[in-house]
Amino acid sequence: MNLSITFGKAMNKALAVSLIVMALASFGSASAAAPVAASDKLTQVRMSIDEDPIVLRLADSLGYLKREGIEIVPVDLEQLTKQDYLMQEPLTKGQIDASYHWFNHTIFGARHELPIKAVMVINDAPGMTVMVANRVKDKIRSAADFKGKNIADGAQYGTKAVITSYLAKKAGVPPSAFTPVMLESEGRLEAVLRGLKEGKVDVMTFQEPVTSALLESNMVSTLYDLNSKASTTKVLGAAFPAQSLLMSPKYIEAHPDTVQHLVNALVRTMRFVNAHTAEEIAERLPADYFDKKDRLKEIKLIRNTLPSYAKGDYSFSPSAVKLVVDAIQASDFDKSEEGQWRATGENSKVKADRLYDNRFVHKAMQAIK
């Protein structure tokens, strides 16, 4: 069976749940911790997936998953836990086998005694741009000038806000010294554009496609480029692991062969991504990836986000992991339920070298050139 990997936050929930039900019906109960061998000899891996990533879609459409004997079954986390950001407990309980999500979730898990590990990095840069309104760019030349400014950087539990605050703190400016604005996700681009015209926003931290839309307005300029490993290292001192493949230590120990085969498939996929243009990548994505989407806009999005993908090396460096840990531990987050989940727990339980396992990706990178 060839499952289309389409579950994500932007996807219609009813359709997502329907897909999961069909998947589980095809393979039987997915409640056991061990992977299940399907009738066509593919090993089922139950995975929670953030958005609709091209890497998993390509791994499927290019045949790399099948080549490694792997079948990914998307799982709706909200059927297992109250929020889709709480993947640590289902992972540690064996309700799911893997999660395609941001590396920082390993830190939150460690804080709450729900240990998970990252076994491969997909994006080694956050894919963000810190921008300054042109009307004040002569006054805001670095994060040291954030004091007293209005800053739009999304929800205050999110990574955009974490990185903005980290830059400010490193420059000696506490988060309390500037004002977060335009926090609502719905209609955010329109709100920021309006705020720029009205002089109500000074600094912005966003990802694509919002970044391009703001830059194309000619009302903002780039202050910090965090879209590639090189540019991120220049700003923050190291790469910043973002989307990664996450698993529980128990699953890794119990099913090393499955982990290796899955990592092999994703390393092959990353080699493909690294070697092709956005247009070439789009040609190899399944047709339904573009359902209800503007194809040209999607290709532009792929093109603009390609720099954030790890190139050649998909392992975790101690310096990169330390950077994410430092940024998270320096963040106050907000008072929302998700913010408090991320803020609470014990920092002393976070051991950076226990947040990742490079064995599988090192082996795959050596074998797959």
Residue ranges of each PLM-predicted region?
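Short, glycine-/small- and polar/acidic-enriched structural segments
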Residues: 34-184, 188, 202-208, 219, ...
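Bacterial N-terminal signal peptides
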Residues: 16-26
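Signal peptide processing junction and immediate N-terminal pro/mature segment
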Residues: 27-35
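Short, solvent-exposed loop/beta-turn-alpha elements that line the ligand-binding surface or hinge
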Residues: 67, 227-238, 304-318
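Conserved C-terminal helix/tail region of periplasmic/extracytoplasmic solute-binding proteins
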Residues: 325-369
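Bacterial N-terminal signal peptides that target proteins for export
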Residues: 3-17
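Pocket-lining segment of extracytoplasmic ligand-binding domains
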Residues: 188-288
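Secondary-structure end/capping motifs
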Residues: 253-337
